[in-house]
From Swiss-Prot:
Domain CBS: 210-268, 277-328
UniProt protein name: Arabinose 5-phosphate isomerase KdsD
Lineage of source species: Bacteria, Pseudomonadati, Pseudomonadota, Gammaproteobacteria, Enterobacterales
Molecular-function GO term, any one: arabinose-5-phosphate isomerase activity
EC class of the enzyme, as a word: isomerase
Source organism of the structure: Yersinia pestis
Protein origin, superkingdom: Bacteria
Binding site for Zn(2+): H82
Pfam families for the chain: CBS, SIS
Reaction(s) catalysed by this chain's protein: D-arabinose 5-phosphate = D-ribulose 5-phosphate
UniProt keyword annotations, A-Z: Carbohydrate metabolism, CBS domain, Isomerase, Lipopolysaccharide biosynthesis, Metal-binding, Repeat, Zinc
Function: Involved in the biosynthesis of 3-deoxy-D-manno-octulosonate (KDO), a unique 8-carbon sugar component of lipopolysaccharides (LPSs). Catalyzes the reversible aldol-ketol isomerization between D-ribulose 5-phosphate (Ru5P) and D-arabinose 5-phosphate (A5P).
Complex and partners: Homotetramer.
Amino acid sequence: MSTFDLQPGVDFQQAGKQVLQIEREGLAQLDQYINEDFSRACEAIFRCHGKVVVMGMGKSGHIGCKIAATFASTGTPAFFVHPGEASHGDLGMITPQDIVLAISNSGESNEILTLIPVLKRQKILLICMSSNPESTMGKAADIHLCINVPQEACPLGLAPTTSTTATLVMGDALAVALLKARGFTQEDFALSHPGGALGRKLLLRISDIMHTGTEIPTVSPDASLRDALLEITRKSLGLTVICDDSMRIKGIFTDGDLRRVFDMGIDLNNAKIADVMTRGGIRVPPNILAVDALNLMESRHITALLVADGDQLLGVVHMHDMLRAGVV
């Protein structure tokens, strides 16, 4: 790294705030460019039967990657192609059903200009995003989106700062407008984010994490209280379910109920579980979202739920299962 002498009188905080002010003013100018061309771009992308192919060089390319990713995760299939690679074979990734969104602040990116005749020959719709509608790219575009800003936040006027922020925001405006047009939902978003926290919350169902079969702590109504306590200890879920031979739920007994029994002075060896159980028990269907089941647990101040179809016991889920699955 090159070394420089610290300039006298430099106020880092003031410099940072000045950048924010300049970029805020630049973004405020974008409002005038959300116009008929913007609507035409949205309509074209909405009706596109292929994908949106985003292109850009340098900093515009980095911003283009983010715009393509935002499109893809909000219901608009998209990917990024580097213009330099496109002119050496990657142009074959683009089909006549696609739309190209080309980004260049100046509108004079040589790498993109080289591709335009080929795109035109294939009748591929070209949307250009630049600061100059009269630029070569602006004139060649089927639709031009202006991202002109008064000044860069860089005091030298060289490093792309305000202009790249404006480009990113215009991309967000397109993506969100299309999201609304598609009626895109949280569930749709989760389908493309199954590995994230939101995906787990919106996709994971109780049936995916519940204990089933021999993992379920159960005893018959004729069992002794002592046998029920042994079952609670063996299965380590903090409860046992009292069921008949057909696994129909008769009641539930938890470690919290045990404290109540001790206070009552009941004989553990002679008492029947049916005499001290809580009838019913809080139940949820197997298709309920895990996050909704967790909310129910928290609202009822309990740590486990029965999973059932009516009176038929299907499984048990504990708060710890939620933690392991990353729902919390």
